[in-house]
């Protein structure tokens, strides 16, 4: 974002967030394309990369300047100035530009807040694996958890109205509204099915994910406000990431909300619960508390009422499940997480007698979801549904070094992402599947057997790109690796991971 802002010359637009002229700048679409280019090696659809060119962007901008927007998205090839091009392709280009431009006000205000609060290492706050270190410290002392699936069916107009609090530029909002209505139809809802079918790649979904997250931020900011009003402690992280410039002007509306919801204002003591913890990623959110089951049930009913009254959206109570942490496993960020009892025996020796004391300590466990990972690998054609490795024919035409690089890239990413697993056996099985699938792909290319191929070239060919966890740790912490010795088998959380792994997220409904 720093490199982008050097080229944008936003100073004259800063006062009023006047972003409309940026929509007609070629470098906006170039930055948007380069930012996400080839991010995922699992993506085999290179159609967009082959079609993208600045000439197409120039023609598209010229058409937008002429304000003949309907001609851009017309199904009639006689009216479409870009014959032979898929209409979705132009939606894709424009959505990338919109997403990049809409993120500018958020980025500016976040950086201003960081500078004001003198927070230098913001990268650590961005890491999604920082959540697990928090869960390890907090969840082992809690009793109940609310597993929440946030509503996703949001009308286009609601998303645009939410964005108005951040972007004051009416021209940009009108063009965005027109674009969304043309794509999704004004009477339809943005659902995961529509997003996944119309925006089949992550790059296409970026705009809709941004709009959806800004909508959820509205809900989270109110919860942060309630928490601050009821507690003398101030959460630095929540105040930083969810701080809203316009929010305190909406307090009157918030009070009216509590008056409408029966019993909400009387029972506002709920938010004073000192051990209520909240985390979210995409549509999945978790509330945990050490309170009684009655308190958790009241929170569930109030959350449902909160969504229905404030957002005018139907929130089905079955979207919130109440579970006890001692016998429930959470599926969050690609991990199976649970709190289990870890028994330990301590011998106490006195002058005359000795005693054996049995202690049961709670431990937060994070496990690799082996079944879902094998299903993801089978869907990507690395193995069958039983987990038996197979060759990947679509990569057989690539060079040997390219094949090795692709398999090694996936293997290292999975090892990096699941380094926090309590048990490594499942991760070793995933490595085995990828290693043998790579060997079979190379053998298929050279029309040989796996055994003959490995005997001819040697096992070093595969070992050089499948880096072990010990090697990763020694590269990351060169001084500490010699001290810890075998400690690389322990849980390690990396603060450079800012998004969930593609294979770990293949079952995501969003």
Curated annotation (Swiss-Prot):
<comment type="similarity">
    <text>Belongs to the intron maturase 2 family. MatK subfamily.</text>
</comment>
<dbReference type="GO" id="GO:0008380">
    <property type="term" value="P:RNA splicing"/>
</dbReference>
<dbReference type="GO" id="GO:0006397">
    <property type="term" value="P:mRNA processing"/>
</dbReference>
<keyword id="KW-0934">Plastid</keyword>
<keyword id="KW-0694">RNA-binding</keyword>
<keyword id="KW-0819">tRNA processing</keyword>
<protein>
    <recommendedName>
        <fullName>Maturase K</fullName>
    </recommendedName>
</protein>
<dbReference type="GO" id="GO:0003723">
    <property type="term" value="F:RNA binding"/>
</dbReference>
<keyword id="KW-0150">Chloroplast</keyword>
<dbReference type="GO" id="GO:0008033">
    <property type="term" value="P:tRNA processing"/>
</dbReference>
<dbReference type="Pfam" id="PF01348">
    <property type="entry name" value="Intron_maturas2"/>
</dbReference>
<dbReference type="Pfam" id="PF01824">
    <property type="entry name" value="MatK_N"/>
</dbReference>
<comment type="function">
    <text>Usually encoded in the trnK tRNA gene intron. Probably assists in splicing its own and other chloroplast group II introns.</text>
</comment>
<keyword id="KW-0507">mRNA processing</keyword>
<dbReference type="InterPro" id="IPR024942">
    <property type="entry name" value="Maturase_MatK_N"/>
</dbReference>
<dbReference type="InterPro" id="IPR002866">
    <property type="entry name" value="Maturase_MatK"/>
</dbReference>
<dbReference type="InterPro" id="IPR024937">
    <property type="entry name" value="Domain_X"/>
</dbReference>
<dbReference type="GO" id="GO:0009507">
    <property type="term" value="C:chloroplast"/>
</dbReference>
């Amino acid at each position: 974002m720093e490199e982008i802002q050097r080229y944008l010359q936003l100073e004259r637009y800063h006062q009023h967030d006047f972003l409309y002229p940026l929509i007609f700048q070629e470098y906006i679409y170039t930055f948007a394309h380069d930012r996400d280019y080839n991010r995922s090696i699992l993506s085999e659809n290179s159609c967009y990369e082959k079609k993208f060119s600045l000439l197409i962007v120039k023609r598209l901008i010229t058409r937008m300047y002429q304000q003949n927007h309907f001609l851009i998205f017309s199904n009639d090839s006689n009216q479409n100035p870009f014959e032979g091009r898929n209409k979705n392709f132009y939606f894709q280009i424009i959505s990338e530009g919109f997403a990049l431009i809409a993120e500018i006000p958020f980025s500016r205000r976040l950086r201003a807040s960081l500078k004001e609060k003198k927070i230098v290492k913001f990268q650590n706050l961005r890491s999604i694996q920082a959540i697990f270190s928090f869960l390890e410290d907090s969840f082992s002392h809690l009793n109940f958890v609310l597993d929440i699936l946030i509503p996703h069916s949001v009308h286009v107009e609601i998303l645009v109205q939410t964005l108005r609090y951040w972007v004051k530029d009416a021209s940009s909002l009108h063009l965005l509204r027109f674009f969304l209505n043309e794509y999704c139809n004004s009477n339809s809802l943005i659902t995961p099915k529509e997003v996944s079918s119309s925006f089949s790649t992550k790059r296409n979904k970026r705009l809709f994910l941004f709009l959806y997250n800004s909508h959820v931020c509205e809900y989270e900011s109110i919860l942060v406000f309630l928490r601050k009003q009821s507690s003398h402690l101030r959460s630095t992280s929540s105040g930083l990431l969810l701080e809203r410039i316009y929010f305190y002007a909406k307090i009157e509306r918030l009070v009216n909300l509590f008056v409408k919801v029966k019993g909400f204002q009387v029972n506002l003591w709920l938010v004073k619960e000192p051990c209520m913890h909240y985390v979210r990623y995409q549509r999945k959110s978790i509330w945990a508390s050490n309170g009684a089951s009655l308190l958790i049930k009241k929170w569930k009913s109030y959350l449902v009422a909160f969504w229905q009254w404030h957002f005018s959206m139907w929130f089905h109570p079955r979207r919130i499940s109440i579970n006890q942490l001692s016998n429930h496993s959470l599926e969050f960020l690609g991990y199976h997480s649970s709190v289990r009892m870890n028994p330990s025996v301590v011998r106490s020796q006195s002058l005359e007698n000795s005693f054996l004391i049995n202690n049961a300590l709670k431990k937060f466990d994070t496990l690799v979801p082996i079944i879902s990972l094998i299903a993801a690998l089978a869907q990507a054609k690395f193995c069958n549904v039983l987990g038996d490795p197979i060759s990947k024919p679509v990569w057989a035409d690539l060079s040997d070094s390219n094949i090795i690089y692709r398999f090694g890239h996936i293997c290292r990413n999975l090892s990096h992402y699941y380094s926090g697993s309590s048990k490594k056996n499942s991760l070793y099985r995933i490595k085995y599947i990828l290693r043998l699938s790579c060997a079979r792909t190379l053998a298929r290319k050279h029309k040989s057997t796996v055994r003959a191929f490995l005997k001819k070239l040697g096992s070093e060919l595969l070992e050089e790109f499948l880096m072990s966890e010990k090697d990763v740790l020694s590269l990351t912490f060169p001084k500490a690796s010699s001290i810890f010795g075998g400690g690389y088998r322990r849980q390690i959380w990396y603060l450079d991971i800012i998004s969930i792994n593609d294979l770990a997220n293949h079952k995501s409904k969003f």
